[in-house]
């Protein structure tokens, strides 16, 4: 996502206006809490029931008044503006907290890029910062980003829109720590072919674990929370009867397993969006591109339309290298323009069926897929990246994110086309 931020060097009247705005926000919070809760002092409000799209009733988390007030004052430290259109890059925690950050900042400042998607919780389940020791996820913390506040202050100064990436259900760390929240193969936590484990989307405690991390990212000052791996493991439909796992509140025998998976994934997104509303952040979800081509992906539980109804931004991962023969294209990696063009047409049709469609901001490819083998891939560079951007723009999609797992991005690209 890309963003333009206001100058952080406030002087004179601008400084005074900021102070006034902060007090207005605090006053509004106090009045709102007085109207809508029974909170007194540091007491917590009773849990409120929230009915999810699937009909499940779920309790929203308690909120403490002092924490809530502090949260909003804290958010007002930074002033970010949503950009004309988000044009962003993926940034690992190692890059964000190391020397690579300066190189990536230079790339953004010298081009029309304007956003960074920064790992806060990576796909191993590790946090890229050190939370307070009292947090339930504290032991997942690392020192990759030693001073998140310093990072965000620098991004504010440079007008780089900050997005926190939170990987949800792919979490080897939590699966091993809490096997009862995962999938068991006999007595062991199940692993995929790459040795990675997932936690169980049916388990409400897993939802809360991740939502609390997202809330902390919002409190840090990130303007958007991007949830990734919001799904069951790939191919789960082939092993759902072999593995041992809780189905939580999704045990209704009248509903088939595919629909239970879809309901659990969609319910998590809806719940997370609701929980994050008081923080004033946008919520986005990464989703497999092929999910938009199906009524729903049977194994992983992703329904493109249902998820899109509960987010501000939908980010389909449409890397040409990740498609088999599709849209009449035998070898999609060799034809990035055509693949992205055809996908964008289909996605526009799907989103056009929704009453309130989210912003479309696809992930596009800035890497070379050598693993596809000779004759099935091409070297990706300036032309291939621009072809994908041009295809999106021709279909009215002006936002995009670039993926390169090592954060080595192509130079000389015209990102505005």
Q: What annotation goes with each model-predicted range?
A:
Residues 77-96, 169-216, 386:
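Active-site-adjacent "subsite" loops/lids of carbohydrate-active enzymes
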Residues 90, 163-167, 226, 259-299, ...:
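Aromatic-lined carbohydrate-recognition surfaces of secreted/lumenal glycan-active proteins
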Residues 97-100, 107, 111, 195-230, ...:
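An active-site-proximal structural segment forming one wall of the substrate-binding cleft
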Residues 102-125, 219-224, 313, 392-398:
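Catalytic domains of carbohydrate-active enzymes, especially glycoside hydrolases
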Residues 111-145, 237-245:
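Aromatic-lined carbohydrate-binding/catalytic grooves of carbohydrate-active enzymes
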Residues 172, 176-180, 223-256:
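Active-site-proximal loop/short-helix segments
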Residues 311-325, 336-341, 346, 353-417:
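Substrate-binding cleft of secreted/luminal carbohydrate-active enzymes
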């Amino acid at each position: 996502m890309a963003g333009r931020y206001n100058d952080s060097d406030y002087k004179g009247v601008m400084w005074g206006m900021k102070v006034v705005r902060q007090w207005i926000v605090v006053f509004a919070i106090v009045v709102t809490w007085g109207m809508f809760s029974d909170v007194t002092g540091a007491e917590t409000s009773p849990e409120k029931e929230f009915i999810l799209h699937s009909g499940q009733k779920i309790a929203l988390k308690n909120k403490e008044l002092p924490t809530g007030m502090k949260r909003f004052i804290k958010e007002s430290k930074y002033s970010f503006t949503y950009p004309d259109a988000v044009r962003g890059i993926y940034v690992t925690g190692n890059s964000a907290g190391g020397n690579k950050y300066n190189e990536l900042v230079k790339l953004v400042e010298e081009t029309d890029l304007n956003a960074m998607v920064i790992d806060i919780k990576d796909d191993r389940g590790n946090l890229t910062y050190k939370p307070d020791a009292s947090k339930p996820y504290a032991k997942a913390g690392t020192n990759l980003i030693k001073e998140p506040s310093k990072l965000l202050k620098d991004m504010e100064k440079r007008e780089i829109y900050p997005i926190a990436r939170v990987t949800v259900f792919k979490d080897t760390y939590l699966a091993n720590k809490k096997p009862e929240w995962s999938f068991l193969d006999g007595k062991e936590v199940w692993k995929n072919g790459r040795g990675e484990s997932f936690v169980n989307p049916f388990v409400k405690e897993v939802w809360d674990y991740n939502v609390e991390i997202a809330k902390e990212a919002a409190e840090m000052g990130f303007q958007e929370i991007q949830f990734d791996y919001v799904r069951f493991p790939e191919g789960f439909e082939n092993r759902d009867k072999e593995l041992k796992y809780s189905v939580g509140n999704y045990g209704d025998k009248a509903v088939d397993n595919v629909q239970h998976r879809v309901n659990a994934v969609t319910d998590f997104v809806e719940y997370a969006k609701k929980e994050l509303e008081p923080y004033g952040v946008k919520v986005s979800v990464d989703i497999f591109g092929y999910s938009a081509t199906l009524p729903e992906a049977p194994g992983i539980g992703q329904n493109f339309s249902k998820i899109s109804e509960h987010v501000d931004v939908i980010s389909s991962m449409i890397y040409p290298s990740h498609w088999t023969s599709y849209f009449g294209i035998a070898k999609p990696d060799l034809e990035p323009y055509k693949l992205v063009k055809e996908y964008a047409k289909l996605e526009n049709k799907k989103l056009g069926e929704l009453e309130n469609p989210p912003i479309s901001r696809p992930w596009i490819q800035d890497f070379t897929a050598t693993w596809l083998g000779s004759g099935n891939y091409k070297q990706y560079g300036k032309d291939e990246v621009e072809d994908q951007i041009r295809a999106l723009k021709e279909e009215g999609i002006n936002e995009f994110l670039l993926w390169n797992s090592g954060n080595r991005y192509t130079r000389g690209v015209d990102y505005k086309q």
